[in-house]
From Swiss-Prot:
Domain of life: Bacteria
GO cellular component: cytoplasm
Annotated catalysed reactions: (R)-pantothenate + ATP = (R)-4'-phosphopantothenate + ADP + H(+)
Originating organism: Citrifermentans bemidjiense (strain ATCC BAA-1014 / DSM 16622 / JCM 12645 / Bem)
Keyword Membrane: no
Name under which the protein is recorded: Type III pantothenate kinase
Gene assigned in the entry: coaX
High-level lineage: Bacteria, Pseudomonadati, Thermodesulfobacteriota, Desulfuromonadia, Geobacterales
Length: 254
């Protein structure tokens, strides 16, 4: 079995693959204060509930945008699984040309998404990933990564409103009953939610205009299923896109 690990700023997503089939997946909060042993215990408990033991895992691949945790999970892989993991970054074969001023600046998760998307759809793509930051990535018809845009994520936007406006409460991210809200909580939700839908559609439409390839628009990430139904540009939600990309990169490097 293959263990794929996607480390984001807010969540760590784990997946277990048996060949090309995703057997189990988990989403846990990212905690930079946790030690190797604490993560080892967490993984052990998750695996035990799924009737999986560490020795079932024959290889590991990691994508991380949190450098401090990259090292922790590399050491965990060696200590608990007796495996030297693949880590997405310099030296890893992706099979995708990256047209960026400095390719090393592109987040590993963005490249992983691009690879998975193009492998699945084989056409020009815009990939919208709703994470701590929301990223927009353009892949052309040749399967080349062309760049993209980064915006504050929904949670960051809502938290900023609470932190910077003294009288506004902290509220959950949700679709309100109406854009013309009747109370403060719904008013904040309306501004963030519908404003964010407009942000997504606006950026996607501008990318389409610049790219001139009529790209397919797919969304992934924790809040994709919340925003996608209101968007006029998102065509499909693929919640496991990043995990699938890690599996593909592993296959290209083993």
């Amino acid at each position: 079995m293959l263990l794929v690990i996607d480390v984001g700023n807010s969540n760590i997503v784990l997946g277990i693959y048996d060949e090309e089939r995703l057997v189990r997946d988990w989403r846990v909060s990212t905690d930079k204060s946790k030690t190797i042993d604490e993560y080892g215990i967490l993984f052990h408990d998750l695996f035990r509930l799924a009737d999986i033991v560490f020795t079932d895992v024959k290889d590991i691949i990691i994508s991380s945008v949190v450098p401090t945790l990259t090292g922790v999970l590399e050491k965990l892989s060696r200590q608990y699984f007796k495996i030297s993991p693949y880590v997405v970054g310099p030296g890893i074969k992706t099979g995708m040309p990256i047209h960026y001023d400095n390719p090393k600046e592109v987040g590993a998760d963005r490249i992983v998404n691009a690879i998975a998307g193009f492998e699945k759809y084989r056409t020009a793509l815009i990939i919208v990933d709703f994470g701590t930051a929301t990223t927009f990535d353009y892949v052309n018809k040749k399967g080349e990564y062309c760049g993209g845009a980064i915006a504050p994520g929904l949670a960051i936007s809502m938290e900023a409103l609470f932190m910077k406006a003294s009288k506004l409460p902290r509220v959950d991210i949700a679709r309100p009953p109406s854009i013309i809200a009747k109370n403060t909580v719904n008013s904040m939700q309306a501004g963030i939610f519908f404003g964010y839908v407009g942000l997504v559609d606006g950026i996607v439409q501008r990318m389409k205009g610049e790219g001139k390839e009529n790209p397919k628009v797919i969304a992934t990430g924790g809040l994709a299923s919340l925003i996608a139904p209101e968007s006029v540009t998102i065509e499909e939600v693929d919640e496991f896109l990043t995990l699938e990309g890690l599996r593909i990169i592993y296959q290209r490097n083993k």
